[in-house]
């Protein structure tokens, strides 16, 4: 097995990726927002979107579900790693301005609150310049770190985490799929300790099972 095949296998073995929802109907919570998203998908037309809320609550998952169901070319950038003007000027602009063969080009900028103010200002210009065929989906933990001109150009939605009960039900389903023996009461301290970070809860459960904790 090559290094890259090994890395891919490791990613797929992570429960948080293995059990990431692949259909909008499998996405738990935020029912009003799901209804709006279904409307976007059915019409084949979406605005610029800004999803904000606490870490691990499904912002990126929802963004990926949208682009999966919209006829589009997609670029995904993690702004916590690439957060400067060069990223916007080179990577994003080149993608947005290039020739495309689908209805839209969609750029997902994950953890956008890490982007510098100058980079955000430049992105605002790109949102206007390429508005005919390019859409941006931004996710962030702290909406107050996003400049107002970008907020005003997006439909903004707060992602509310599912209830603790719903999270526990989802975790139980994962454990059953993995054929793990467990007592439902064992989930209580993990869910209570890391809620509302669903990603952290899933990772902790996997670590506990693998490590025999």
Regions found by a protein language model. Give the residues of each.
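P-loop/Walker A NTP-binding region and its immediately flanking N-terminal helices
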Residues: 1-157, 165-166, 176, 184-192, ...
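AAA+ ATPase "lid" subdomain C-terminal helix
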Residues: 180, 193-213
């Amino acid at each position: 097995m090559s290094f890259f095949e090994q890395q891919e296998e490791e990613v797929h073995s992570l429960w948080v990726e293995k059990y990431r929802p692949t259909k909008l109907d499998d996405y738990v919570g935020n029912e009003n927002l799901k209804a709006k998203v279904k409307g976007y998908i059915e019409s084949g037309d979406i605005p610029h979107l800004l999803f904000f809320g606490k870490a691990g609550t499904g912002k990126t998952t929802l963004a990926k579900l949208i682009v999966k169901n919209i006829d589009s070319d997609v670029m995904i950038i993690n702004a916590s790693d690439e957060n400067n003007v060069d990223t916007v000027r080179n990577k994003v602009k080149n993608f947005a301005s290039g020739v495309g063969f689908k209805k839209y080009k969609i750029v997902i900028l994950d953890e956008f609150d890490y982007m510098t103010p100058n980079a955000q200002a430049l992105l605002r210009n790109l949102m206007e310049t390429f508005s005919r065929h390019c859409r941006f989906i931004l996710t962030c933990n702290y909406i107050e770190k996003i400049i107002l001109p970008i907020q005003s150009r997006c439909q903004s939605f707060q992602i509310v985490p599912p209830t603790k009960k719903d999270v526990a039900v989802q975790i139980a389903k994962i454990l059953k799929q993995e054929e793990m023996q467990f007592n439902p009461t064992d989930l209580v301290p993990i869910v209570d300790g890391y809620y509302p970070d669903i990603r952290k809860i899933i990772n902790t459960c996997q670590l506990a099972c693998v490590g025999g904790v």
